[in-house]
């Protein structure tokens, strides 16, 4: 894993903007439903469901929507769909590697949406395995900055729980661990009285390609097109950009 990724900062800000638009609500609800179906409807005994609910609450998803998603997933309420996880791999303009994580009840629709997004935005789909080796599944916890909280405070709280790295994202800290240590790291933060925005397993790139303003715009255009699909849950890409490039993107 390379050091601090400025793209992570942009991604964090983008998530906040998307949430304000309500774009994330359906995806967060789907996460809850699938977590409840996989591990049961009790958050106390299902850490994945607990974290999915916490993220939805942080994003202001109404409690009623959350409760109904849990019930659908647990089979207590009708209307739940049979979602499958499907991964697609491809390249954005400039050779940036892209992993697309879909959660869908219609494989053909998902495949079509992903293919169209790549072809219309200068990218290309790749064979399975040609991109995924560049990423590893990691535990990622985002901790908002509060007055007086610094990197050492966060690291001190999570080091014994298996955390490997703490990155400063500007408005928040990002704690990285093995995916299997995610719950332990999140619990350690809670025990230390530290709030967190999200705790989830993500695909983190081992190396990153630095892009200029034009390159960043092209990659982000592709990511936006992919995320517009209801079937796409997450998009991961191995690109980074300097502060100057990010500042220009903010002006767009």
UniProtKB/Swiss-Prot annotation:
InterPro entries cross-referenced by the UniProt entry? Integrase-like_N, TACO1_YebC-like_2nd/3rd_dom, TACO1_YebC_N, Transcrip_reg_TACO1-like, Transcrip_reg_TACO1-like_dom3, YebC-like
Q: Which domain of life is it from?
A: Bacteria
Name its cellular compartments.
Answer: Cytoplasm
| Key words, A-Z | Cytoplasm, DNA-binding, Transcription, Transcription regulation
Predominant location: cytoplasm
GO biological process terms, alphabetically, are: regulation of DNA-templated transcription
GO CC annotation, single: cytosol
Q: Name one GO molecular function term.
A: DNA binding
* Transmembrane portions of the chain: none
Q: Which family does it belong to?
A: Belongs to the TACO1 family.
Q: What is this protein called?
A: Probable transcriptional regulatory protein Bcav_1989
């Amino acid at each position: 894993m390379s050091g601090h990724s400025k793209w992570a900062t942009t991604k964090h800000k983008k998530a906040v903007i998307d949430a304000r638009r309500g774009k994330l609500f359906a995806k967060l609800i789907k996460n809850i439903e699938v977590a409840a179906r996989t591990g049961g409807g009790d958050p106390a005994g299902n850490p994945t469901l607990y974290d999915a609910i916490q993220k939805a609450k942080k994003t202001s998803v109404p409690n009623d929507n959350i409760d109904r998603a849990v019930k659908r997933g647990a089979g207590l309420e009708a209307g739940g769909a049979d979602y499958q996880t499907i991964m697609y791999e491809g390249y954005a303009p400039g050779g940036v590697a892209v992993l697309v994580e879909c959660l869908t009840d219609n494989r053909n629709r998902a495949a079509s949406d992903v293919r169209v997004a790549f072809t219309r935005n200068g990218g290309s789909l790749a064979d399975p395995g040609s991109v995924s080796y560049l990423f590893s599944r990691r535990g990622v916890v985002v901790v908002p900055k509060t007055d007086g909280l610094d990197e050492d405070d966060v690291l001190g709280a999570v080091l014994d729980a298996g955390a490997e790295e703490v990155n400063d994202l500007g408005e928040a800290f990002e704690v990285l661990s093995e995916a299997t240590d995610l719950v332990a790291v999140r619990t350690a933060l809670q025990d230390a009285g530290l709030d967190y925005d999200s705790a989830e397993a993500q695909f983190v790139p081992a190396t990153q390609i630095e892009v200029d303003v034009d390159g960043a715009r092209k990659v982000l255009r592709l990511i936006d097109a992919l995320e517009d699909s209801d079937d796409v849950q997450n998009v991961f890409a191995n690109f980074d950009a300097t502060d100057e490039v990010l500042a220009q993107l903010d002006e767009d």
